[in-house]
Structures are given as structure tokens and as C-alpha cells.
């Protein structure tokens, strides 16, 4: 199978999955719980859930993004002068971030996730200082800045727009197969245009609660291989209220 036909196959499969799985579940969830609707929708939902046992693996990021947002993940072309200059400036910005954090004595925080959030602020400031106007991406529908979710940074250079996600990693986890990249459907996607997508990831070293930056990687994500994991979830309100299908059997104080 050729690359183009394989790409088309991924696109077709993913579009079918979205249609077959997500649409019926959404419709069933929106239907009032009336006597005439319940049996049919129950069967429909069970059928869809059965199909969800089929796992989707190794779907390229560009296929997923276009299916979810309608926007393309563009190819990073090192022979494109604008792309080459962006990469050069990203390297300079990454070095600036490392130097500033080192001069500050590192980042001290008990929560490693917060370390990543702090680094994001350094990255946006350094990129902007290097001539790449970097901001928090805005939702395509609302136009409001959205911090949570992929990607972390939207930036522009010479009239071309780009996206970048900031990450941290430990040297010992580089070959880990645990999930570290997430992309979810949204009614207000942060991806609002065709663009090249990057990751800037800093390797960290830790001494107590203080983190230093050791090295960095810049990665182009166009063909990043993604797996799709289906997940059902709930929350404390539904778990412990005795409503929404749960039944509290005991609720007593400990002596």
C-alpha cells in the first residue's frame, strides 16, 4: 500500500469512527428519557459500546487534527527559509529559557506539573523576545484564551502561524510507553488555522523540590503516531449523592 493510500485509509477510518461512535452516543444522551425513546436508544448505545472495543492505533496527528478541527497540520520544511528561521529562533529561545532559569537558581515547586506551567510562561516570553509573537491559543468559536488542552502556544513569524506545545521529561522516561501526549475533541478548539506544529520539551534534573533544565528537544509533530483510548468517567457529585444511578448503602462517622 502506498503512503498516500495509507494516509487516505487512516483518514477514512477515523472519520467513520467519529461518525459511528460519537454521533449515536451524543444523540442518545440528548434524547429525553421517555418511555418510547428508552428501549431503542438503550439498544443503540449498547451496540455502539460493543463497537468501541475495536482499538485505533498509530493514527497520524495530521489526520486526527483535520478530522476534529478542519485544519491541516502542515509539513515542516527545512528548505523553506521561513521555517528554517523559525527553527533557529526556537533554538535561541530555548537557550534563553534555560539560561534565565539557571540564573534564578532553578524552579522550586513541590508539584512537577506546576514546573511545566511555569516553564510555559518563560517560553512565551523568550519566543516573543526573539521576534515570534507568542500567545495562549484562543478558542476558534469564542475567541477567548484557553490555557487547558493542546496546544500551549500559538505564535506567528513573517505572517505565518504556528503552534507549539511545551513539555518536560526526565532522561529515564524517554523510552517510556506511558501516555504523555493528549488531544481531545472540543466544541471550542484551540487549533483555528492550518499550521506547523512543534513540541519544545525540556529535560529536567531534580534536587529536592528544585528543578534545573539540562537539555531540550524540538520536535515536528505532523506525522506523530497517536492511539485512541475510549474512556467512561463520572464525578464525586454523581458517585456520592445517591442520585444519578448511584445508591449510598452506608454513610457513617469513624470513631
Predicted regions and their residues:
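Catalytic cores of nucleic-acid endonucleases
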Residues: 166-211
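N-terminal secretory signal peptides that target proteins for export/translocation
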Residues: 1-10
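Bacterial Sec-dependent signal peptides at the C-terminal "C-region" and cleavage site
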Residues: 25-31
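A short acidic/basic microdomain associated with nuclease active sites
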Residues: 120, 124-156
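Domain-level recognition of nuclease-like catalytic cores that cleave nucleotide substrates
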Residues: 196-254
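Bacterial N-terminal signal peptides
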Residues: 15-24
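Interdomain/boundary linker segments immediately adjacent to catalytic/signaling cores
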Residues: 31-122
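Conserved catalytic cores of phosphodiester-cleaving nucleases, focusing on short active-site segments
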Residues: 153-155, 162-170
Amino acid at each position: 500500500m502506498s503512503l498516500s493510500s495509507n494516509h487516505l485509509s487512516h483518514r477514512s477510518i477515523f472519520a467513520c469512527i467519529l461518525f459511528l461512535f460519537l454521533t449515536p452516543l451524543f444523540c442518545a444522551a440528548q434524547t429525553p428519557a421517555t418511555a418510547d425513546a428508552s428501549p431503542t436508544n438503550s439498544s443503540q448505545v449498547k451496540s455502539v459500546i460493543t463497537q468501541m472495543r475495536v482499538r485505533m492505533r498509530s493514527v497520524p496527528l495530521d489526520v486526527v487534527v483535520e478530522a476534529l478541527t478542519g485544519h491541516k497540520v502542515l509539513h515542516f520544511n527545512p528548505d523553506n527559509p521561513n521555517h528554517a528561521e523559525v527553527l533557529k529562533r526556537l533554538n535561541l529561545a530555548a537557550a534563553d529559557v534555560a539560561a534565565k532559569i539557571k540564573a534564578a537558581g532553578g524552579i522550586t515547586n513541590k508539584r512537577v506539573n506546576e514546573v511545566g506551567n511555569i516553564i510555559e510562561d518563560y517560553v512565551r516570553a523568550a519566543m516573543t523576545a526573539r521576534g515570534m509573537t507568542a500567545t495562549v491559543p484562543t478558542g476558534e468559536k469564542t475567541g477567548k484564551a484557553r490555557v487547558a488542552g493542546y496546544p500551549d502556544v500559538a505564535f506567528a513569524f513573517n505572517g505565518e502561524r504556528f503552534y507549539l506545545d511545551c513539555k518536560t521529561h526526565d532522561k529515564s522516561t524517554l523510552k517510556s510507553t506511558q501516555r504523555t501526549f493528549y488531544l481531545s475533541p472540543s466544541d471550542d478548539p484551540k487549533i483555528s488555522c492550518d499550521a506547523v506544529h512543534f513540541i519544545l520539551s525540556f529535560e529536567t534534573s531534580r534536587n529536592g523540590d528544585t528543578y534545573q533544565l539540562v537539555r531540550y528537544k524540538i520536535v515536528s509533530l505532523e506525522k506523530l503516531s497517536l492511539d485512541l483510548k475510549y474512556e467512561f468517567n463520572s464525578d464525586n457529585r454523581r458517585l456520592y449523592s445517591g442520585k444519578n444511578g448511584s445508591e449510598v448503602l452506608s454513610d457513617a462517622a469513624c470513631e
